[in-house]
């Protein structure tokens, strides 16, 4: 079992209350009938609020499917993709591969809603010091959007030193 596997299976806990834009407020922002893929859904807390949400997570059996994002092949079309703290780990090559996969499974006008960590290992749980956080920034967002045919629609600070980011597939 890897450090990140152990950390998310045994130590990490969700706390949507501490985020203003990327927490429970998303319930009012996203159309209730949207077809949503929740990437790294954790405990799948949005599932009960959206009838067409499908949650994937490599470390949590509350997901609809326990699978790494890079290995997931959609079983249907989605129009909203949530990455609320899930594609924040590893080096640039790792994140680039994840975004390439995101490009491959999205279509024109799909929306991606992110909670991005700017590289801070500030989780309060034991084992966080072993996790490599990717240093998200506006520059990285612009770089990946340009490279993979997305449009950066929104980049703004959320509470807790995180970024609320929206991309649209062009």
Feature roles, as predicted:
Residues 1-73, 113-170:
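Class I (Rossmann-like) S-adenosyl-L-methionine-dependent methyltransferase catalytic domain
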Residues 85-89:
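Short catalytic micro-motifs in class I SAM-dependent methyltransferases
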Residues 91-93:
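Short N-terminal helix/helix-N-cap motif within the alpha/beta-hydrolase-1
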Residues 96-108:
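A short glycine-rich, Lys/Arg-flanked "PGG" loop and its adjoining helix->strand segment in the class I
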């Amino acid at each position: 079992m890897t450090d990140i596997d152990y950390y998310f299976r045994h130590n990490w806990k969700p706390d949507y209350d501490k985020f203003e834009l990327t927490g429970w407020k998303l319930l009012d922002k996203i159309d209730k009938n949207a077809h949503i893929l929740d990437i790294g859904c954790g405990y799948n807390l949005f599932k009960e609020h959206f009838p067409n949400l499908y949650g994937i997570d490599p470390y949590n059996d509350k997901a609809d499917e326990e699978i790494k994002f890079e290995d997931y092949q959609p079983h249907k079309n989605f129009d909203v993709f949530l990455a609320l703290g899930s594609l924040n780990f590893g080096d640039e090559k790792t994140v680039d591969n994840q975004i390439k996969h995101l490009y491959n499974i999205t279509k024109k006008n799909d929306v991606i809603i992110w909670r991005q960590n700017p590289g801070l290992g500030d989780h309060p749980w034991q084992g966080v010091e072993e996790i490599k956080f990717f240093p998200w920034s506006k520059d990285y967002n612009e770089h990946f959007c340009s490279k993979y045919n997305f449009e950066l629609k929104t980049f703004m600070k959320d509470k807790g030193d995180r970024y609320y980011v929206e991309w649209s597939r062009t």
